[in-house]
Amino acid sequence: MTTRKPLGLPSLKLISIAAVAGIIAGAAAVYIKETGSGNGGGETASGQCTAAKDLAQKITPLAKGQVAAMVAANERRKLTTVAFNDADNKPVTLDSFAGKTVLLNLWATWCVPCREEMPALNALEKDMGSDKFQVVAVNIDTGDDEKPKAFLSETGVDSLKLYRDNTIGVFNSLKKEGLAFGLPVTLLLDDKGCLISAMNGPAAWDSEDAKALIKGAIGL
C-alpha cells in the first residue's frame, strides 16, 4: 500500500474507512432510499457461472486487508443484463464487457466515501486496465452529467470512462438481488459477466491487497 495517493487524497483516510467496512459489512456506505425501478438483474445461470463460483472460493483468501469486506458469491449469478449509459448517453449492458474481468462500482458525487474512493479506482484502472480487466464506475447522480463530469475533472480522474444511470435503476436492480445496500457498492465479475464477489462500502483499490485480488481473479 502506498503512503501517498496518486491523485493527492490521503491513503490513511481510505484505510480507516475500508477497515470499518471490513468489520461491519457496508457500515461505511452511504445508504439511499430506493427510488424508481430497477433494470436487468441477475439471470438463472446454473451451468454458465459454475467457474465463477469456483473462482470466488479460490480467491477468498485474497480478500483481506484493504479488501477484506469483499464477500464471495454464494450462488451462481449472471449479471450481463444490468444496464446503464456510456459517455455518449448510449445504452450499454454488462454484456458489452464480455471477455473482460470487470470491477463494477456504483458511485455518486453526493456520496463522501465514493468521492474519496474514486482516485483509488482511477489508479487501479491506470495500473491494471487492459484487454483482460476494466474498472467500470457507474455514476448514479440524478439530473444531467454536469456534476459528475466536473468532479472527475477536478480530482484528476482521467483513466475511468464516465458511465451513467440518472434513473438509479442500476442500483435498484442490484438492491433487489441483495447485492447493494448503499454507496459505494462494488462487484467483481468474471469475463462472462458472472458474479465473483461483492462489497458494500469503500476500499483502497490502489492497494497491494486490491491488486492481488484482481490478479487472482484474472489468473495472473
Locations of the language-model features?
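Structural microenvironment flanking redox-active thiols in thiol-disulfide oxidoreductases
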Residues: 115-156, 166-174, 212
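Thiol/disulfide oxidoreductase modules built on the thioredoxin-like
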Residues: 150, 154-159, 165-217
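N-terminal targeting signals for export/organelle localization
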Residues: 1-78, 220
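Conserved hydrophobic packing residues within short motifs/helices of P-loop NTPase cores
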Residues: 104, 136-138, 187
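Alpha/beta-hydrolase fold active-site loops
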Residues: 101-102, 133, 184
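A short beta-strand-turn-helix
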Residues: 71-76, 81-102
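Extracytoplasmic
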Residues: 77-79, 97-99, 130, 143, ...
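Conserved redox-active cysteine motifs that mediate thiol-disulfide chemistry
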Residues: 98, 106-123
